[in-house]
Amino acid sequence: MKSIRLKGIAIVAGTLLLLGTISGPALGAEPVKGKVMIYTSIYLHIIEQLKPTLKQKFPNIDVQWFYGGSEKVITKLVAEFEQGNTMADLIMIADPAYYNALKRDGKLLQYRSPNHKYLFPDWVDKDGYYSGVRMNIMGIAYNKKLVAAKDLPKTWWDLANPKWRGKVGMPNPLLSGTAFVSTAGLARSPKHGWRFFEALRKNNVTCEPGNGAVETKLLSGQLAVGMLLEENVLKAASEGKPLGFIYPSDGPVVIPAPIGIMKTTKNQAAAKVIYDFFLSKEGQQAIVNGWMPSVRPDMPAPKNAALMIKDVRKFALPMDWEAISREPEKVKEKFDQIVLH
């Protein structure tokens, strides 16, 4: 009888140990702590929203941020790589193609998050080096006071219509990550190609530093229509500003902006915990609150978005992220020649 009781205790103890291994650190394990530096292009208002949440959930982790546009972050990383190391533990920028380049160069840590199974499968790197963390949708924005319903552009090519001459704008792909991948995608598209940008140039397109600058000029009336992210329009509309958004029928650009852990991180445990948080429902709610679609199909759409991301994907512009990752300078040089000079 005593032997049976001892066996029972051993089985229970083994089960508890197994459960602890599956669900998290074993009882008595040291809490994850230390500094985590995140390089990101995510909006400052989302960072400010996240700071108290992260502090409450992870009191022993000092989460620090370097904020800048995607191209600014990439420039910083390249400079740090040349010096031999980077201060970044995690990166979150809006250029999926760049993560392919980092993966090829051995700069990312392989990590299969337990939250990967909740994401759209094609937005998780098949080898586990990164995954989407937020969605950006590039489409067409317009000033409701300047554009009548009958004149609304329906396709990307409509931006080249002479009636918008001098009144159409776009963010600069040399400075903005979302503008770069949108430009690269359209340039590779058989329906568009570089002839689309040649047509925009003939229509006196205004090239602004970023999406925020395009939004500002649309609201001031300097522009009537333009290439802009859905999240800019949703946020502006929530504040009562007269902006509308159109998903071009010839393919909105859907950008699964990723998150990845740098291979050189000195705090893998903390970096993984923060990575997991961003892919959790709580972390993704902050993304949705920031007017962007979630990478999880079980999350709601941003407030007042006309379509769910699963529906936008059905007619989105096809994107070859691997090919785009191999020709960033070629795309930027071509755009510079056609549009900026």
Model-derived features with residue positions:
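Periplasmic-binding protein-like
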Residues: 121, 136, 197-201, 207-208, ...
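Extracellular/periplasmic bilobal clamshell ligand-binding domains
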Residues: 304-341
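Mature extracytoplasmic/periplasmic domains
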Residues: 257, 262-319
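Extracytoplasmic ligand-binding site segments that recognize negatively charged/polar headgroups
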Residues: 41-48, 68-71, 86-222
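Bacterial N-terminal signal peptides
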Residues: 10-21
